């Protein structure tokens, strides 16, 4: 199995450097691996490397019912972290809660900044994880405590517009980072350690991998349409046979 790597995954065969490959445990299927390697290693570096979460912490995590989000829900629960997640439908809210998310905010029906402030008694949270980008960026900053950390790790709604660094000062001496998985698994040792942590949680029953949508390789256009319409939940995979 592998995560990331060179562009060109929409193919029957790939050429991947041997040092980027990982041996799957016998108990984990190829379909599970396809649905968890990129997503699970992303959660590992977000929660265990970039900013090590501790039991009792409270966080905001956008897109809590997506492929990364559902793993994050379960990982946060295993760590004893209170996770406040945002979703775009009642169905997705139920799914996130069922996977361990402590509180869910439906951004279609609620102002997520106001609701988070209510849930935290006006304090905000020390860390926000935002893979949505343009649509949520300003609100995410408003959810942070003074000296809080904004982790912008995706831009599903579009790139974040340019902004002045002085805004970070005026909002409470905030920190911001734009990480990628590649920089947290650049060394073979880092990749193996992250994979072992992920595999261990799956085999221990702490993580259940949701392969929610499966498409034949010739259905890739429909797969993109479904994701762009935000009607998917969990992970989507392409099947080559």
Model-based region annotation:
Residues 1-241:
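Terminal helix/beta-alpha structural elements that buttress the NAD(P)+-binding lobe
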């Amino acid at each position: 199995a592998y995560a990331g790597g060179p562009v060109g995954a929409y193919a029957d065969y790939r050429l991947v450097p041997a040092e980027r490959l990982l041996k799957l445990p016998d108990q984990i299927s190829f379909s599970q691996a396809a649905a968890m390697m990129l997503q699970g290693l992303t959660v590992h570096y977000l929660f265990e490397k970039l900013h090590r979460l501790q039991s009792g912490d409270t966080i905001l995590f956008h897109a809590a019912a997506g492929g990364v989000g559902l793993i994050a829900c379960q990982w946060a629960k295993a760590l004893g972290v209170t996770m406040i997640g945002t979703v775009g439908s009642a169905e997705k809210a139920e799914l996130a809660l069922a996977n361990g998310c402590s509180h869910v905010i439906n951004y279609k029906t609620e102002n997520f900044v106001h609701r988070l402030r209510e849930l935290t008694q006006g304090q905000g949270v020390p860390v926000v994880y935002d893979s949505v980008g343009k649509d949520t960026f300003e609100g995410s900053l408003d959810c942070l405590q003074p000296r809080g950390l904004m982790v912008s790790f995706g831009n599903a709604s579009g790139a974040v517009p340019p902004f002045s660094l002085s805004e970070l000062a005026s909002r409470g001496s905030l920190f911001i980072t734009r990480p990628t998985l590649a920089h947290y698994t650049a060394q073979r040792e880092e990749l193996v350690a992250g994979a072992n942590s992920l595999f261990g949680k799956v085999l221990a029953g702490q993580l259940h991998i949701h392969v929610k949508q499966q498409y034949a390789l010739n259905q890739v256009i429909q797969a993109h349409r479904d994701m762009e319409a935000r009607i998917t939940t969990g992970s989507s995979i392409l099947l080559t046979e």
